[in-house]
Amino acid sequence: MSSCALVQRPPPWRAAVAPGDGMVAVDGTQFVVDCGRTIFFSGFNAYWLMMMAADPALRGAVATAFQQASAHGLNLARTWAFSDGGDQPLQSSPGVYNETMFQGLDFVIAEARRHGIYLLLCLTNNFDNFGGKRQYVRWAGDAGHNLTSDDDFFTSTIVKSYFKNHVKTVLTRVNTLTGVAYKDDPTIFAWELMNEPRCYADPTGAMVQAWVEEMAPYVKSVDGRHLVTPGLEGFYGAGEHESKELNPWGIYYGTNYVATHRTAAVDFATIHLYPDVWLWGSSADEQATFFRNWTRSHIDATAAYLGMPLLVTEYGKFLWKEVGANKAQRNYFLDLVLDAIYASASRGGPLVGGAFWQLLLDGDIVAGMDSLRDGYEIILAEDSRAASIIGEHSEQLAALNGQDADVLCRRASSHRRTRLGNSLSCGGGDTLELLLRMVLACFVSLSRSISSFIVQNFILL
């Protein structure tokens, strides 16, 4: 009998756990590896890795970044697997690729693997930085198609074919350094369809929803082993169970947090956190209140309506002197975010990790690094307090790795019953439905475990 006999069968399209293959999979609200043991993520953003690694003279900077990250316990890097058009393209025109840039991405993956760091690779951008959806629409226009808005990216047949070709090209790429196809490399944790998808042409979220419903299964058809996420910031829409009153400024961004993450081929949920930008001009207390409401709402919604893991894939606090921000305020924000992640993770909740924006190196050591400063950068070698906060959090999460996901599910269920039970007496709206959904989710999880055990120990014998 296999020692992995109790690994749960995932829902349709969810990435399955293959014993010993090192691929990250999902088990309820937890990420798991190998024999269904939990893994939590303390991560960073470094969008610039591929661009830097494309220049052999600068590859040392990429190696140093991974080395510093690993030394502080970080085990996840989120970075770009795209550069659409422009001066440093990965894809210079539809279907035409820059081999030098691709070899830079090869190096990033190989170096991450060497340092034990997983990669969350993003496939395009909502914004025009490094091309994104605007460049795809321009390419279609240059080919004679009458498109009038960047948001035509989500509906144009020709544009969608361009993007699907990019997906297939990246996922089937064979790394020139390791000889492993991207789609088979366990170093890659997951594919992110787009960085921060928004659609002002359709505030209801229907256009983005339809696009995700088409693209997420397409990714799975090319690569059925890796996880997929849309890349949402967490903004709510007009759909069912959407807490739209929590959106910054109370407006719609053309996405539905709950509905879009319910797409069959989506494996986990994401949110971003930038209270000082989203609530421009607000006080520190107002931002802290927003942060608590935002995270609590998404944790509860994810547990109740999605039953999948949740990551804060970007969080940041700027240090612009013009608005009086300083490192003490930034470090307080780091404490808030990381404490919330650990509180959820330690109780078996769905919020199981995050990635700060952004990791940079000392510009005096690495030429050109100062040009990447955006006010959010964290340079571990020069900010000892931030480095200490991040390192301690990494150690806390690492201590939680390797648990049985079913045990965490039962612990989380018990905790939620206690917390929600207290709120029921206050007439808390949807709390009864929330509780019932959580109980049902754990029942389904237990049923899958029993079914898997029967199949592997009796039917397959």
From Swiss-Prot:
It catalyses: Random hydrolysis of (1->4)-beta-D-mannosidic linkages in mannans, galactomannans and glucomannans. InterPro entries: Glyco_hydro_5, Glycoside_hydrolase_SF, MAN-like. Substrate binds at W80, N195, Y274, W357, D364. Keywords: Glycosidase, Hydrolase. It comes from the Eukaryota. The keyword Hydrolase applies. GO terms for biological process: polysaccharide catabolic process. The active site is at E196 (proton donor), E314 (nucleophile). SUPFAM superfamilies: (Trans)glycosidases. One of its GO terms (molecular function) is mannan endo-1,4-beta-mannosidase activity. Belongs to the glycosyl hydrolase 5 (cellulase A) family. PANTHER family: MANNAN ENDO-1,4-BETA-MANNOSIDASE 4, PTHR31451. This is Mannan endo-1,4-beta-mannosidase 4. The gene is MAN4.
